[in-house]
């Protein structure tokens, strides 16, 4: 583990850019960027176009390490190059800490939740991540209803994988998303917090994790998770809120910082001139940074 990057992730001012749309969500991400499905004829072309989009984001002067602490990449992105360097090295050289999405998507809903599908090649992926100088990982589950067994299963699965990731020298971001439209969202979050606390308490002193959570209904609910000795940082997802709404809610939560994907890229278009693109990205970065750093 890179100690300088750990220091930046623990104490740095800023947020994490989530650039990890995978195969399933890529057509939608490209469409929002203004690239329609008739502009590519196969998956290779699609992934090249999305890599071009991400390259445009990370090479922009608006993608500044003064405001962006880290970036989460999709596996394809990790294996591709930006300006002649592997993406992780390009980011690290720029001062942005690289993370890798390692989950294989969500299983069918059961007990009001979606667990992660099995990650059969996890060891191999983590070895490649280490070769590519990746600092940490991210994996997402989804909680849809207040079901204590389901929530417990989600958290147990996350920590089970987290321990394997830590053993390989990486810092896992544990992401048990709570659907923002869940009927009992506030109650779900209280159960989730208690389960996460149990998971954290099961770790040894040197086993560090990060948490990526839905912005809680009750402000500052997760503050004591952020203060837990095994937690490097708690970040939040935008989860379907508009950028303005997500930023507004984030400002009410001390110590939590953003890890936004759609809310970061929502105003970016393929047709923009470089100047327009840099300004749109810069405006998004500035507003998300402000919500992460300057609290109410």
From Swiss-Prot:
<dbReference type="InterPro" id="IPR000741">
    <property type="entry name" value="FBA_I"/>
</dbReference>
<dbReference type="InterPro" id="IPR013785">
    <property type="entry name" value="Aldolase_TIM"/>
</dbReference>
<comment type="similarity">
    <text>Belongs to the class I fructose-bisphosphate aldolase family.</text>
</comment>
<feature type="active site" description="Schiff-base intermediate with dihydroxyacetone-P">
    <location>
        <position position="212"/>
    </location>
</feature>
<protein>
    <recommendedName>
        <fullName>Fructose-bisphosphate aldolase class 1</fullName>
        <ecNumber>4.1.2.13</ecNumber>
    </recommendedName>
</protein>
<keyword id="KW-0324">Glycolysis</keyword>
<comment type="pathway">
    <text>Carbohydrate degradation; glycolysis; D-glyceraldehyde 3-phosphate and glycerone phosphate from D-glucose: step 4/4.</text>
</comment>
<keyword id="KW-0704">Schiff base</keyword>
<dbReference type="GO" id="GO:0006096">
    <property type="term" value="P:glycolytic process"/>
</dbReference>
<keyword id="KW-0456">Lyase</keyword>
<dbReference type="InterPro" id="IPR023014">
    <property type="entry name" value="FBA_I_Gram+-type"/>
</dbReference>
<feature type="active site" description="Proton acceptor">
    <location>
        <position position="175"/>
    </location>
</feature>
<dbReference type="Pfam" id="PF00274">
    <property type="entry name" value="Glycolytic"/>
</dbReference>
<dbReference type="GO" id="GO:0004332">
    <property type="term" value="F:fructose-bisphosphate aldolase activity"/>
</dbReference>
């Amino acid at each position: 583990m890179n100690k300088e990057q750990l220091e930046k992730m623990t104490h740095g001012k800023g947020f994490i850019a989530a650039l990890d749309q995978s195969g399933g969500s890529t057509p939608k991400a490209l469409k929002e960027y203004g690239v329609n499905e008739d502009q590519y004829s196969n998956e290779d072309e699609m992934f090249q176009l999305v890599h071009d989009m991400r390259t445009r984001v990370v090479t922009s002067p608006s993608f500044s390490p003064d405001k962006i602490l880290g970036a989460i990449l999709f596996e394809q992105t990790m294996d591709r190059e930006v300006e002649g360097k592997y993406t992780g090295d390009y980011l690290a050289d720029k001062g942005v800490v690289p993370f890798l999405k390692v989950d294989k998507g969500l299983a069918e809903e059961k007990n009001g939740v979606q667990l992660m599908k099995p990650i059969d090649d996890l060891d191999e992926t983590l070895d490649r991540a280490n070769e590519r100088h990746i600092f940490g990982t991210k994996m997402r589950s989804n909680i849809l209803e207040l079901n204590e067994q389901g929530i417990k299963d989600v958290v147990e699965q996350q920590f089970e994988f987290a321990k394997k990731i830590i053993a390989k020298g990486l810092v896992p971001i544990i992401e048990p998303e709570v659907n923002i439209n869940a009927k009992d969202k506030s109650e779900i979050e209280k159960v989730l917090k208690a389960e996460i606390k149990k998971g954290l308490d099961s770790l040894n002193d040197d086993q560090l994790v990060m948490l990526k959570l839905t912005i809680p209904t009750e402000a500052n609910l997760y503050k004591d998770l952020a203060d837990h000795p095994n937690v490097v940082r708690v970040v939040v997802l935008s989860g379907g809120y508009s950028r303005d709404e997500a930023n507004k809610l984030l400002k009410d939560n001390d110590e939590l910082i953003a890890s936004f994907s759609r809310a970061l890229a929502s105003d970016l278009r393929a047709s923009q001139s470089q100047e327009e693109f840099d300004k749109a990205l810069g405006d998004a970065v500035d507003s998300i940074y402000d919500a992460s750093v300057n609290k109410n």
